[in-house]
Amino acid sequence: MANDVIEIEGKVKETLPNAMFQVELENGAVILAHVSGKIRKNFIRILPGDRVTVEMSPYDLTKGRITYRFR
C-alpha cells in the first residue's frame, strides 16, 4: 500500500498558513502540499520559486507531500 505513491517535480507558487504550499506541477496542475516530517525536523526552509519533489496519493490528486527541495 505504501508504494502506491506518485512522485512528481514541481515549483512552489505560494506559501500558505500551517506549513502548506501551492505547488505547480510539471504538467501544469496546481495542488496543495504540506511538508514531510524529515524536512520539518531538519528545519529546511521552502520559499516560493523553489523546485521540489512531491509525493501524491493516486486516490486524491489535489493534495501532496513535499519530500525534497532542490538546491
From Swiss-Prot:
A Gene Ontology term for the protein's cellular component: cytosol
Protein name: Translation initiation factor IF-1
Residue ranges annotated for the S1-like domain, each copy included: 1-71
Superkingdom of the organism of origin: Bacteria
InterPro entries given in the database record: NA-bd_OB-fold (IPR012340), RNA-binding_domain_S1_IF1 (IPR006196), S1_domain (IPR003029), TIF_IF1 (IPR004368)
Alphabetical keyword list: Cytoplasm, Initiation factor, Protein biosynthesis, RNA-binding, rRNA-binding
Function in brief: One of the essential components for the initiation of protein synthesis. Stabilizes the binding of IF-2 and IF-3 on the 30S subunit to which N-formylmethionyl-tRNA(fMet) subsequently binds. Helps modulate mRNA selection, yielding the 30S pre-initiation complex (PIC). Upon addition of the 50S ribosomal subunit IF-1, IF-2 and IF-3 are released leaving the mature 70S translation initiation complex.
4Fe-4S among keywords: no
The keyword Nucleotide-binding is assigned to this record: no
UniProt similarity note: Belongs to the IF-1 family.
Subunit structure: Component of the 30S ribosomal translation pre-initiation complex which assembles on the 30S ribosome in the order IF-2 and IF-3, IF-1 and N-formylmethionyl-tRNA(fMet); mRNA recruitment can occur at any time during PIC assembly.
Annotated GO MF terms: ribosome binding; rRNA binding; translation initiation factor activity
Compartments reported by the entry: Cytoplasm
